[in-house]
Amino acid sequence: MKLSKTVLILLAGAMVFAQDDFPIKDFTRSPTEHIINRIDDPFVVRSVSGVVTLHHQAEPLAGVLLEIEGQGTDKRLRKSISDESGRFHIRGVPSGTYYFKATRNGFQSVIGTLIVSRKAPKGSAVKIEMHVGV
């Protein structure tokens, strides 16, 4: 999994990416959010489910807001909050390519792409590691 850091610059209340043009305007913004990490390689899954953990530790993170937004004509925002085991699930997501964002106050947000496909390996899941800090 290749991870790159994208730093947000706040100009007159507008969010602008310093490195790329990943669309985040429709996603929820944490009150303390200043750093967003991007996972470059897309997750390929049969359904949108997975786990969020603390970076470099197996400690699950509860209370992480995971949002996905379709590309093209399917711009509907779908969301889930990770449970005490760090697990989340968004039901009824049709096949396609989606942007995602994981956010929790006090942590650096994570963005990336996921591909929902019936051809994905069984048991495939989204695995997100979040860094402490804003």
Language-model features, listed with the residues they occupy:
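Beta-strand-rich domain onsets/edges
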Residues: 19-47, 53, 129-133
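Structural motif
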Residues: 50-62
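Short amphipathic beta-strand segments in non-cytosolic proteins
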Residues: 64-79
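Short beta-strand edge segments in extracellular beta-sheet folds
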Residues: 114-121, 129-133
